[in-house]
Amino acid sequence: MRGGTSALLHALTFSGAVWMCTPAEALPIQKSVQLGSFDKVVPSREVVSESLAPSFAVTETHSSVQSPSKQETQLCAISSEGKPCRNRQLHTDNGYFIGASCPKSACCSKTMCGPGGCGEFCSSNWIFCSSSLIYHPDKSYGGDCSCEKQGHRCDKNAECVENLDAGGGVHCKCKDGFVGTGLTCSEDPCSKRGNAKCGPNGTCIVVDSVSYTCTCGDGETLVNLPEGGQGCKRTGCHAFRENCSPGRCIDDASHENGYTCECPTGYSREVTSKAEESCVEGVEVTLAEKCEKEFGISASSCKCDNGYSGSASATSHHGKGESGSEGSLSEKMNIVFKCPSGYHPRYHAHTVTCEKIKHFALDGAGNHDTTTYVARRRYPASL
C-alpha cells in the first residue's frame, strides 16, 4: 500500500484471510484494500475508526439457494437493496460494492466492519448488523438471521428454510399438503380430494387457503358440483360420440351434456336419468300403432283396466326381436290384451306379450307381415 503520510497498518489473520486496515486520519483520496491476492480500489468516505475490533463467533452453514414464493413469509432478510442500512456496503471478490440490509428491527453498526475494517465502507467481506454477522460469498452467517433463532415463528405445518445468498434470508414454507404464508398453514384444497373433483384430465389450482378452481381438459366443461366446489364434466361429441352409434353425434350446447344424437331408421333416441343420449334399436310409436302393429287389432280394441287411464295417442317404445323385453313406460298404462286369431298370449315375470304363431294379414290388401313384434313394456303379472 502506498501513501504520503505515515500510516499504522494492522495485519490480522481471520479464517485463513489477511485483513488490513488504515486509520481514518491516514486515508487518501483513494485507498487500496488487499484481500488475499486481490487488490481492489475503493472510493474514500468519511469514516470513524475503532481502536479495537469486536470479538465474535461465526457458525458456518452451507445450503442451496431457496427463494421464498410470494405467499411465504420471510422472517429476516439478507439483501442487496441497501435498506435500512444504507450506510453499510459489502465488498465482494469481484471488486464491486453492493448494498446490504439487516434483519427486521436489527440495527446496522456504523463503525464496525469486522477485524481490520474501519468506517462506513468494509475492507472485507464482513458486515455487522447489530448482533447478526453476515458473510459472503462462502454462504455462512451467525447471529439472529437463522432458522435456529427465527424458526419457532413458523406454523407447526411449515418448515424453516435458509437462503444464504445476497437477497435471501430465512423464511417459512408450508409442508406438502398445506398452503399459506408459512406463519399460518391450512390443508391444501388441491389435495387428492380436490384433484379427484377436477377429473382425470383436469388440473386443480389453489385460489386461497380454503378454495380452488379447475382447468379442464378437452371435451370437459367447468361446472359447479352439487356437493359444493367445482369440477370438470365430460361434454359434447368429443366425450360422447360412441353413445350415438350407429347414429350421428351433434354438438349442441342447449343439451345438458352438450350433444344430441341423430339416429338412423329402425333406431330411436333414448335419454337416461343422467341426460346422456344414445341410439337404441326400435322406434317410438303411439298406442294405436302398437295395437295395430304388435297385436293386429284396431286401436278401438285397446283399452285400459279399471283404475288406469290412457289414450291411443300416448307414445311407447316399440321394439323388434326378443320376446319378454322390458320397456320404459309407466305401469299405469296397463293394456288389456286380446290376442287376435293366429296369436297366443305368452306370460313372463311381470310381462305379457302376444306372439305371432303364423303369417297374419295386417291389411285388407293381402299383404303379409313376417316380422315378430314384441311389446317392450312392463305389466302386472296378474294379466
Swiss-Prot record:
Region listing for Lectin-like, in residue ranges: 67-145
Spell out the residue numbers of the propeptide: 27-66
Q: How is it modified after translation?
A: Removal of the propeptide occurs in a post-medial-Golgi compartment. Removal of the propeptide is required for the host cell binding. The presence of propeptide does not affect dimerization. The presence of propeptide does not affect sorting to micronemes.
Q: What does the annotation give as the result of altering residue 302 to G?
A: Does not affect dimerization
Sugar-bearing residues?
201
Disulfide bridge positions per record: 190-204, 198-214
What keywords is this UniProt entry annotated with? Cell adhesion, Cytoplasmic vesicle, Disulfide bond, EGF-like domain, Endoplasmic reticulum, Glycoprotein, Golgi apparatus, Secreted, Signal
Q: Where in the cell is it found?
A: Cytoplasmic vesicle, Secretory vesicle, Microneme; Secreted; Golgi apparatus; Endoplasmic reticulum
Region annotation (Required for proper sorting to micronemes) maps to 146-189, 190-236, 237-290
Task: Write the signal peptide boundaries.
Answer: 1-26
Q: Which Gene3D superfamilies match?
A: Laminin (2.10.25.10), Plasmodium vivax P25 domain (2.90.20.10)
User: Which InterPro entries does the UniProt entry name for this protein?
Assistant: EGF-like_dom, EGF_dom
Q: Where is this region: Involved in dimerization?
A: 294-359
- UniProt function note: Adhesin; can bind both the host cells and the parasites. May be involved in parasite invasion by acting as a bridge between the parasite and the host cell. Triggers innate immune responses in mouse macrophages via the TLR11/MyD88/NF-kappa-B pathway. Induces TNF/TNF-alpha secretion in mouse macrophages. Induces secretion of IL6 in mouse and human macrophages likely via different mechanisms. Up-regulates expression of NOS2/iNOS in mouse macrophages. Induces mouse macrophage polarization.
Q: How does the annotation summarize its subunit structure? A: Homodimer; dimerization is likely required for host cell binding but not for trafficking to micronemes.
What is the name attached to this protein's record?
Micronemal protein 3
Q: Which organism is it from?
A: Toxoplasma gondii
Gene of this entry: MIC3
